[in-house]
Curated annotation (Swiss-Prot):
Belongs to the ATP-dependent AMP-binding enzyme family. CoA binds at residues 190-193, 310, 522, 583. This is Acetyl-coenzyme A synthetase. Its EC number is 6.2.1.1. GO terms for biological process: acetyl-CoA biosynthetic process from acetate. The gene is acsA. Catalyzes the conversion of acetate into acetyl-CoA (AcCoA), an essential intermediate at the junction of anabolic and catabolic pathways. AcsA undergoes a two-step reaction. In the first half reaction, AcsA combines acetate with ATP to form acetyl-adenylate (AcAMP) intermediate. In the second half reaction, it can then transfer the acetyl group from AcAMP to the sulfhydryl group of CoA, forming the product AcCoA. Gene3D superfamilies: 3.30.300.30, N-terminal domain of ligase-like. The keyword Acetylation applies. The modification N6-acetyllysine is found at residue 608. It comes from Xylella fastidiosa (strain 9a5c). PROSITE patterns: AMP_BINDING (PS00455). The lineage of its organism: Bacteria, Pseudomonadati, Pseudomonadota, Gammaproteobacteria, Lysobacterales.
Length: 647
């Protein structure tokens, strides 16, 4: 197996960016960022062209990030209106339902424009104004895209909540941003199972702190029986279908908020990542076109859910701003068979395919036959996102899925970054399996040691970014101090990513995983503190500690150590009760893979739980425990190890 895949000269010849072009542009983007990004911003349609390009400070006493701050635009105009003349009849969305025997559908740019205008008008009639927050809790259906763009059209700030989250998680997000309106569906469909979306919203709205919600719009998707609470609840089609198909767009300042997306933090409470309009749209559209080497006739499929940042940036805003044809898939990779992804690729002649290592590893386990019974000849580029991809999975993806002829763009970025930061470009970058390779234009990565000293040359350390880029988050909604403390206090004058990384002799970057108390499960971040506080809220639990451990499919799994209150004894029934409790309080994604009963937890004399030691026990690495002399009771380590080793 070669560990270097050199650029295909035929690809480089036609690519948007070749090697020489990359070096020139990258140098320009660092040396003259204002001129560089001013030029790139011209890819959008502005009501008022920006002249103030960049105003950024990472100083702790004044952290602020502003790009294109005197420009005015509207995101939905850039995703819809400007395409109508030349691309009005082009397919914007290809919808592939959960059930393979259900009919797929196409929505043109003109049809999407009219539907977005209708919903925009409906929202205005329901007293939603510029700056109001709207929560979107929908399955992967076209109306989810319509809802997002309708909010953008009228200047409402959308907060999309992943359809797998439970009522408590929905309520937390409503409470934090003060949503006035929720758009949901009767039910979702996922792998043949119904997801009770409306029932979850009803349960969430009974929780204290959600009284800001005035209206719930309900999309009729499955036709399942639900409770409608009048006058709060309204059928989506009743309200929307009667509206006019023209809707005047709101003139938005580039720094006006576009959306809030909640991501897990190490302190337990999910944080509302705030992205603004101009810089985010410039960055997502530019990275989408450049990284995926977009062509006019491409059929582009990103398998992420719209409830995550990848769905926002690389299903909705980036691709539609570029006038691309986007496949929207409601289903899962293994339903009804493990060939589903590859069958969908053949059915719709997908050319660009962007998925997560978790899906690749799960499908790799099923062998080559389910892939090889399909053609996949339409594919020309493969992408990976969400977590590091191990070289074995990379090779399988390249050799079996791509037939050894499709380059892989292994992309690194975060909810907070808005778009892709480190990535290969297919005409410019030789590939190394497992490496995210080199920084995108304008991105200045560095590795630092625990003291914040910048490490030169080949090194391993914590990944920081030395300067800003237009797609960067601006603040934590309603809590700018938390923004400063989370990202800028650890290593002054830099943005701290929370990821560990190494750089090799060729300057290639290799992401090694989270270094804070956040677990990356199947590319989705969950804070350990959030799971711990949920477990401790159970009446039989005295204390809990949660860590990540290597998982062969998901990348990381959840390992929970649980101490019961006096008088309670461990049992399989209680184990199942705790799993159900977490699933109900947060969602299935946060369910622990392992629960180890712990009579006590390893703590320092000051009472701090030593998670480093718990991580090593979970990893079954007793030889890597390090110094345990600071523990108040070192004997607990042997006890936990013995219990772990009997699993």
């Amino acid at each position: 197996m070669s560990d270097l895949y050199t650029i295909d000269p035929m690809l480089a010849k036609d690519a948007h960016v070749d090697r020489a072009h990359y070096k020139t542009l990258y140098h320009e983007s660092l040396e003259q960022p204002e001129a560089f990004w001013s030029n790139i911003a011209q890819r959008l349609e502005w009501f008022k062209t920006p002249t103030k390009i960049k105003d950024v400070s990472y100083q702790l006493e004044d952290v602020h990030i502003r790009w294109f701050e005197d420009g005015e635009l509207n995101a939905s105009v850039n995703c819809l209106d400007r395409h109508l003349t030349l691309r009005g009849d082009k397919t914007a969305l290809l919808f592939e339902p959960d059930a393979p025997d259900a009919p797929s559908s196409r929505i043109t740019y003109r049809e999407l424009y009219e539907r977005v205008c209708q919903l925009g008008n409906a929202l205005r009639h329901l007293n939603i104004e510029k700056g109001d927050r709207v929560t979107i809790y929908l399955p992967m259906i076209p109306d989810a895209v319509v809802a997002i763009l309708a909010c953008a059209r009228i200047g409402a700030i959308h907060s999309v909540v992943f359809g797998g989250f439970a009522p408590n998680s929905i309520a937390d997000r409503i409470n934090d941003c003060g949503s006035k309106l929720i758009i949901t569906a009767d039910e979702g469909l996922r792998g043949g199972r119904k997801i009770p979306l409306k029932a979850n919203v009803d349960a969430a709205l009974k929780i204290h702190g959600t009284q800001s919600v005035e209206t719930v719009l309900v999309v009729r998707h499955t036709g399942g029986t639900i409770n409608m609470h009048t006058p709060r609840d309204r059928w989506f089609h009743h309200v929307v279908d009667i509206q006019a198909t023209e809707c005047a767009p709101e003139r938005m300042n580039a720094e006006d908020p576009l959306f809030i997306l909640y991501t897990s933090g190490s302190t337990g409470k999910p944080k509302g990542v705030l992205h603004t309009t101009g810089g985010y749209l410039v960055y997502t559209s530019y990275t989408h076109e450049t990284v995926f080497d977009l062509r006019e006739n491409d059929i582009y499929w990103c398998t992420a859910d719209i409830g995550w940042i990848t769905g926002h940036s690389y299903i909705v805003y980036g691709p539609l701003a570029n006038g691309a044809t986007v496949l929207l898939f409601e289903g899962v990779p293994h339903y009804p068979t493990v060939s589903r992804f590859w069958e969908v690729i053949d059915k719709h002649h997908v050319t660009l395919f962007y998925t997560a290592p978790t899906a690749i590893r799960a499908l790799m386990r099923e062998g080559d036959t389910p892939v090889k019974k399909t053609s996949r000849k339409s594919l020309r580029l493969l992408g990976s996102v969400g977590e590091p991809i191990n070289p074995e999975a990379w090779h399988w993806y390249y050799t079996i899925v791509g037939n050894g002829r499709c380059p892989i763009v292994d992309t690194w970025w975060q909810t907070e970054t808005g778009g892709i930061l480190i990535t290969p470009l297919i005409g410019a970058t030789d590939l190394k399996p497992g490496s995210v390779t080199l920084p995108f234009f304008g991105i200045r990565p560095a590795l630092v040691d625990t003291n914040g000293q910048i490490l030169d040359g080949p090194a391993a350390g914590n990944l920081v970014l030395l300067d800003s880029w237009p797609g960067q988050m601006r603040t934590v909604y309603g809590d700018h101090q938390r923004f400063i403390d989370t990202y800028f206090r650890t290593y002054p004058n830099t943005y701290f990513t929370g990821d560990g990384c190494r750089r090799d002799a060729d300057g290639y970057y290799w992401i090694t995983g989270r270094v804070d108390d956040v677990i990356n499960i199947s590319g989705h971040r969950i804070g350990t503190a959030e799971i711990e506080s949920t477990l401790v809220a159970h009446p039989k639990v005295a204390e809990a500690a949660v860590v990540g451990f290597p998982h062969p499919i998901k990348g990381q799994g959840i390992y929970a150590y649980v101490t019961l209150i006096t008088g309670e004894t461990p049992s399989e029934a209680l184990h199942q009760e705790l799993l159900t409790w977490v699933r109900k309080e947060i969602g299935a994604i946060a369910t622990p893979d392992h629960v180890q009963w712990a009579p006590n937890l390893p703590k320092t004399r000051s009472g701090k739980i030593m998670r480093r030691i718990l991580r090593k026990i979970a990893e079954n690495a007793p030889d890597q425990l390090g110094d345990t002399s600071t523990l108040a009771d070192p004997s607990i380590v042997d006890l936990l190890l013995n219990e772990r080793l009997t699993h």
